[in-house]
Each structure stands twice: as structure tokens, then as C-alpha cells.
């Protein structure tokens, strides 16, 4: 019995010893395997880093097997030594800026969101912006045009947004080729403002789209004459910094620094036109696109001063009329108002300014071009003098785009037009026309334009020499003089000097201000669009893409005029429901 017990003890001891030995062996094996894997990764990263630093940075490098997912994770980084395991990695040096994006396999598009190009000083939000150093995106997949965490404070309800909003989004087609040659570099379009939707029609045509946020409203366009306050047109300065960022980094993402276009719609289009008029002489931009911008090319594009409205807003929000500690001092002015408003919540400030119905636009500066004088609103175009041409940049093509009913939505939304008597409508029209043409032209224009008799409810309106007019016709009258006529006049002046200015007016049913941009940004499978609207959207995308790539929106042909006058050179889309046609008029002769 003792012998058996000894044998059992020995067996158990041996088994325990072997178990411990096997456990230790497995532990050391796992440890060695881990160390080996770590050194292998370090070696691989070092080799990749050496390759990246000794050669041109790769635009897109795809690692691993392909997948069928519609979206893949992408890293947009400035540091090639960051070890991140992802399907698609982009190594680019962009002032040490890091951001996350998505890969859209449907159109083979890479989207990069939330790239910081400057910082707003939160202590002094009306002041100069600050440079970006070692910035990393903290918002993940963030669309700067729609996410209130990164977009600029809105001037419309619900007044959301943040002060530190100087970001940009970049969209491009993915490629993995040798981009060392100029032939492969892609043209760039810098689109100003917070646009909702996708610009895949431009990206699919080989254009790199960069959407830029900049300060607008009161934070972007404080106009004053107080020498103590060094704030002036910060919104324009933000745009300048964004352009500088793009030109400095364009080659890193295969962008062509010789083909950079600045574009905008509506109020953003006004900023584009302002930049063209005041700063085109020193910017590396080779084209401009202005969509649906009212009063283009005129002095009305700028405001002289909004100091009084700032002081009023500051007092409403609690600023004392005189300094608390110095009652002998005079009343506070714009300097004190701006200092006080710097510490007011943006939403509260925007609400007060909205109630005061104040619109902030770029402030006038030193005129570098006499284009606004040559064709300014209120002056009849009599031809361009040779001395005026030397101030007009004839080397930079400009594309202007309008719809035939830009003003229609404003008329429809204003109840005063719906219930006004004839004399009220006539006064409104005369007020609009008198700002632009000599009085004797008012009656003449009404006789030519208003030809559609109609009734609004039970009322008949006769604002122009006994002719009746409906709301739609009134919208077209105001559109011609708020949007189309000023643009036509600046085109006439520029083309008279040999410039390449293009103007297109779209006429499609029930369209008004903003519908051209809405169609351009519509999705390919959007169900609420008709077949013709899809054709129209594709046509707009094709023209803009061709203009960005080549400098002209359509193929040039004989007797094709590159501009328009009040009644000539109009491109009409919707001449027939299912066909897109181009109608041009040169010296009174219509060609189809």
C-alpha cells in the first residue's frame, strides 16, 4: 500500500512539473512571438518612413484586400510615421493637420472633413485669426457645411454654430498613380460657404472640390471708420487664408496650382465678386464663378459703415451708454461696442441683429479696378474707354450664372406684394429701376418686359402704363434689375476690353433663387427630381467642370459670343421639357 501511495505521489508530482513546464514554454513562446511581431512592425514602419521621406508622398495607398463596403475608413494625416491600421491611408504633409474622412466606392470619391486652416481667437472673435499648429480632428466624420459643431455662426434661425469655425472639407477622386507630371494634376475649385449636399458631379469630372467655411455676418464684415479698431473685412481675410492654404498644399494632393477657381452662390457669390474686384491682382486664382449674386459688379456690393447698428445691438444686450467708472466720458462708440460684443454669446448677438434686420456685407476698400465705375448700377453703358480697360483683368475668365426668376421667391414670401394696390407695385418697381437707369427708361422697360396679363385673387394690377402684371411677372422684372442686368453690364464692359466673361441664365418652370445650386448638389438617385431636372443638373455640372478645367463652359464655335447684354446671349435650359438647348444671340442674330 505504501509503495502504491509513493507511486501516486511521484506521478502527481511529475504531472504537475510537466504542466508547469508546458505553461512556462507557452508563455515564453507567446512573449517571443509578440516581441518578434513588434520588431517586425517597427521595421516595416521604418522602411515605409524612409521611402516616404526620400520620395514624393503617395496620394492614396491601399493596403490589404478590397472589400464591397460602400464606405471605408481613411486617414488624412501630415505625419508619415503614424502607425494606423486602416484599409486606405493617405500620407500628406499639410501643416501637421490630421482629419478623418470616408471612401465612397459608389463614385470612387475620397472625402476629408474638418481640416483646420486657421483658428478664431475666442477672446477676440472679431479680430485676426491665428495660425494652426499640430491640429487633429476631434469630430470624426464631420461635414463642415452641416455640422453645427464646426460651422460658423448662422445669420438665420436657429442661429447655431461655433466661433472657431475656420475649417474646410476636401473631396476628390481616389487614384494611385505617379503624379509627378503636370498632366496628372487635377484642377481645384474652392467653394465658399456652407452648402448642403454633394458636388459629386464636379468631382466625377476630375475636379478637386474644397468647401471653405469663413466668418460671415457681424463677425466677418464689421465696417467702421474708427482708427482705434483694427478690424476690417475679417471674412475676406479668412478667404485669403484659405486660398493660401490651398496653394501651399495643392501639390500634396495632386492639385494643379495653375488651375484654381474661386466659386460661390448668393451672398457667397458676392464675396467671390468682391475678391475678384479688389484682390485679383495679387491672388494665384485663374478663374471665378459667381452664381446668383445680386447687384454684381456695383458699388451696392459693399456697405460703407455698420457702426451704428453695432452700437445699438450692444446697448440692447446690456452695454451702458457711458463707462461706469467715468461718467464724464462721452457716449460709447463702435470701439466699445465691439469690445463688449466679443464676450456675448454668438446666438444672442445673431438674434438681436436679425431682429434689427441688418445685413452685413464686405466693406469697401481701395479700388484696384474701375470695373464698378465703368458698369456700376445707375450708369448707362455707353462703351468702354481704353483708359478703363487697363484696370480690368482680361486674363482671368469669369462665369456668371443666374435663373430667370431669382427674385420670385422674395416676391412670393412678401405679403405686401400679394395685397398691394397698383400704385404700390408701381412705386416698388420705379424704386428698383430708378437706382439703375435714368427715369425715362422705366416706362420703356415695362412696355418690353411685362406682357402677361393676369389676376391676383380679385385684384388686377396695372403698374406699367395700363398693362396688368402677376406675381411671377413682377419677380422677373425685379430679377432682371437685381441680378441679370447688373451682371450683363459688367460683362459688356469686360468683353469690350477683350476679357473672357461668360453669363448663363437658366429658365425652367417654377425655378427661383437657389434652385440652380439645389439641382447641382442633388444626388444621382434623388427620387423627387424629374427626368428633365436630372438632365439640367448634369448640364450645370458639366459646364462648371469644363470651365474649371479649360477656362470656358462650352465648346467654342464660330460666331459664339462669350458674354451677354440685356437681351442677348442667353442660354435657356427648358426650351422643351426633355431637351437641353443652347440659344445664343450675336448682334441681333439668333443661332440655335
From Swiss-Prot:
Presence of keyword Glycoprotein: yes
GO molecular function: carboxylesterase activity
Known catalytic reactions: a carboxylic ester + H2O = an alcohol + a carboxylate + H(+)
GO cellular component, one term: membrane
Transferase is among the record's keywords: no
Stretches that traverse the bilayer: 12-32
Organism annotation: Spodoptera frugiperda ascovirus 1a (SfAV-1a)
Domain of life: Viruses
Compartments, record wording: Membrane
Membrane topology label: Single-pass membrane protein
Enzyme class: hydrolase
Protein name per UniProt: Putative esterase
Positions annotated as glycosylated: 68, 83, 95, 447, 510, 528
Family: Belongs to the type-B carboxylesterase/lipase family.
EC numbers: 3.1.1.1
Source organism phylogeny: Viruses, Varidnaviria, Bamfordvirae, Nucleocytoviricota, Megaviricetes
Amino acid at each position: 500500500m505504501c509503495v502504491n501511495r509513493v507511486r501516486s505521489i511521484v506521478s502527481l508530482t511529475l504531472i504537475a512539473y510537466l504542466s508547469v513546464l508546458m505553461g512556462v514554454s507557452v508563455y515564453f513562446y507567446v512573449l517571443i512571438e509578440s516581441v518578434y511581431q513588434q520588431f517586425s512592425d517597427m521595421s516595416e514602419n521604418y522602411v515605409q518612413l524612409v521611402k516616404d521621406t526620400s520620395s514624393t508622398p503617395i496620394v492614396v495607398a491601399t493596403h490589404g484586400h478590397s472589400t464591397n463596403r460602400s464606405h471605408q475608413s481613411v486617414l488624412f494625416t501630415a505625419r508619415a510615421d503614424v502607425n494606423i491600421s486602416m484599409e486606405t491611408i493617405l500620407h500628406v504633409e499639410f501643416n501637421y493637420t490630421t482629419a478623418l474622412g470616408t471612401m465612397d466606392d459608389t463614385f470612387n470619391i475620397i472625402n476629408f472633413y474638418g481640416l483646420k486652416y486657421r483658428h478664431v481667437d475666442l477672446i477676440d472673435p472679431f479680430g485676426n485669426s491665428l495660425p494652426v499648429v499640430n491640429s487633429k480632428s476631434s469630430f470624426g466624420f464631420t461635414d463642415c457645411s452641416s455640422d453645427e459643431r464646426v460651422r460658423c455662426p448662422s445669420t438665420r434661425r436657429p442661429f447655431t454654430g461655433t466661433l472657431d469655425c475656420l475649417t474646410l472639407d476636401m473631396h476628390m477622386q481616389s487614384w494611385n498613380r505617379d503624379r509627378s507630371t503636370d498632366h496628372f494634376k487635377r484642377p481645384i475649385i474652392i467653394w465658399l460657404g456652407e452648402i448642403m449636399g454633394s458636388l459629386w458631379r464636379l468631382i466625377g469630372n476630375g475636379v478637386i472640390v474644397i468647401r471653405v467655411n469663413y466668418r460671415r455676418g457681424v463677425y466677418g464684415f464689421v465696417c467702421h471708420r474708427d482708427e482705434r479698431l483694427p478690424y476690417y473685412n475679417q471674412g475676406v481675410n479668412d478667404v485669403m487664408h484659405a486660398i493660401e492654404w490651398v496653394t501651399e498644399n495643392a501639390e500634396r494632393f495632386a492639385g494643379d496650382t495653375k488651375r484654381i477657381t474661386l466659386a460661390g452662390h448668393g451672398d457667397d457669390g458676392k464675396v467671390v465678386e468682391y475678391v475678384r474686384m479688389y484682390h485679383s491682382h495679387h491672388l494665384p486664382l485663374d478663374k471665378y464663378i459667381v452664381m446668383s449674386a445680386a447687384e454684381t459688379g456695383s458699388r451696392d456690393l459693399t456697405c460703407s459703415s455698420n457702426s451704428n447698428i453695432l452700437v445699438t445691438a450692444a446697448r440692447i444686450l446690456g452695454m451702458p451708454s457711458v463707462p461706469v467708472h467715468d461718467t464724464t466720458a462721452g457716449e460709447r462708440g463702435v470701439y466699445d461696442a465691439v469690445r463688449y460684443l466679443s464676450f456675448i454669446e454668438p446666438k444672442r448677438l445673431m438674434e438681436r441683429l436679425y431682429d434689427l434686420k441688418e445685413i452685413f456685407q464686405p466693406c469697401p476698400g481701395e479700388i484696384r479696378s474701375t470695373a464698378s465705375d465703368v458698369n456700376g448700377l445707375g450708369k448707362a453703358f455707353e462703351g468702354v474707354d481704353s483708359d478703363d480697360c487697363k484696370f480690368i483683368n482680361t486674363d482671368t475668365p469669369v462665369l456668371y450664372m443666374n435663373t430667370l426668376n431669382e427674385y420670385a421667391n422674395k416676391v412670393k414670401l412678401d405679403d405686401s406684394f400679394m395685397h398691394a394696390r397698383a400704385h404700390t407695385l408701381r412705386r416698388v418697381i420705379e424704386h428698383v429701376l430708378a437706382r439703375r437707369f435714368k427715369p425715362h427708361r422705366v416706362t420703356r422697360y415695362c412696355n418690353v418686359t411685362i406682357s402677361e396679363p393676369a389676376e391676383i385673387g380679385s385684384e388686377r394690377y396695372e403698374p406699367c402704363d395700363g398693362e396688368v402684371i402677376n406675381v411671377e411677372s413682377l419677380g422677373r422684372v425685379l430679377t432682371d434689375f437685381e441680378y441679370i442686368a447688373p451682371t450683363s453690364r459688367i460683362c459688356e464692359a469686360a468683353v469690350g476690353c477683350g476679357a473672357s466673361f461668360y453669363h448663363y441664365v437658366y429658365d425652367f418652370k417654377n425655378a427661383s433663387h437657389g434652385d440652380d445650386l439645389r439641382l447641382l448638389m442633388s444626388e444621382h438617385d434623388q427620387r423627387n427630381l424629374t427626368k428633365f431636372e436630372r438632365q439640367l443638373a448634369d448640364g450645370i455640372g458639366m459646364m462648371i467642370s469644363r470651365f474649371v478645367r479649360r477656362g470656358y463652359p462650352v465648346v467654342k464655335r464660330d460666331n459664339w459670343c462669350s458674354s451677354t447684354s440685356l437681351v442677348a446671349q442667353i442660354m435657356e435650359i427648358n426650351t422643351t421639357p426633355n431637351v437641353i438647348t443652347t440659344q445664343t444671340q450675336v448682334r441681333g442674330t439668333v443661332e440655335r
